[in-house]
């Protein structure tokens, strides 16, 4: 598969979040979709880390169906564009962070927009969305970043989204995340919700997250494409970040 994730295993006090926050930096919208699906799963308290079948169709983020299908309150903090200082997220809430991967790392612009976020021992899910090549150290980087700001990373995941370089002529993970991806994300979130309710709220080591195997030929083709893309960018630049 091309989805990787970790869940918390340490036993502490049971926790039932009163509110689920999604905190996203998502220029193309793919990270926002994954974050919304995981957050909906967290609120449902069901499913399995490895079984997307437990999550049926996932409503689109922001729809009435999505809001009415879960009991928890939802707040989206979208930091894609410059905004005011975000609120401090309380310890009785849960936060779902999602950012895109750029060159195996979290995009510097994402870290800049997230730097003012603060928690109070708030459990956090850290998610990286990558263009089907590699997520590198982005997940571990994001986990360390939010931990420094008062959050406890209790789960981590990496999901595929359509690459920002994708075009009709050279599609890269075209149409991702698709319905199956969102079902996987919701199932993952549901398992996290269960673990929180069972008191498994200790921090995870996001560095243990392993990438799916990528055939060498696919890597070489991608590298060739990127080199060509960069040459074209020098001639006719296209802005990929807001």
Sequence positions of predicted segments:
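Short, positively charged and aromatic/hydrophobic N-terminal segments
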Residues: 3-11
């Amino acid at each position: 598969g091309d989805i990787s994730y970790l869940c918390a295993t340490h036993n502490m006090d049971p926790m039932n979040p009163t509110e689920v926050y999604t905190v996203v930096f998502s220029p193309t919208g793919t990270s926002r979709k994954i974050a919304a699906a995981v957050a909906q799963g967290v609120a449902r308290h069901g499913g399995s880390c490895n079984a997307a079948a437990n999550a049926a169709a996932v409503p689109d983020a922001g729809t009435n169906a999505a809001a009415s299908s879960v009991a928890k309150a939802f707040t989206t903090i979208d930091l894609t564009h410059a905004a005011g200082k975000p609120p401090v997220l309380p310890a009785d809430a849960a936060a779902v962070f999602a950012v895109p991967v750029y060159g195996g790392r979290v995009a510097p612009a994402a870290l800049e927009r997230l730097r003012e976020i603060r928690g109070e021992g708030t459990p956090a899910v850290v998610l990286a969305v990558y263009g089907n090549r590699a997520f590198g150290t982005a997940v571990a980087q994001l986990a360390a970043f939010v931990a420094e700001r008062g959050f406890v990373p209790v789960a981590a995941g990496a999901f595929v989204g359509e690459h920002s370089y994708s075009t009709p002529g050279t599609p890269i993970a075209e149409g991702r995340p698709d319905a199956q991806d969102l079902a996987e994300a919701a199932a993952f979130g549901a398992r996290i919700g269960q673990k929180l309710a069972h008191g498994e709220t200790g921090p995870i080591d996001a560095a243990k997250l392993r990438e799916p195997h990528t055939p060498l030929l696919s890597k070489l083709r991608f590298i060739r494409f990127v080199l060509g893309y960069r040459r074209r960018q020098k001639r006719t630049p296209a802005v990929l970040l807001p």
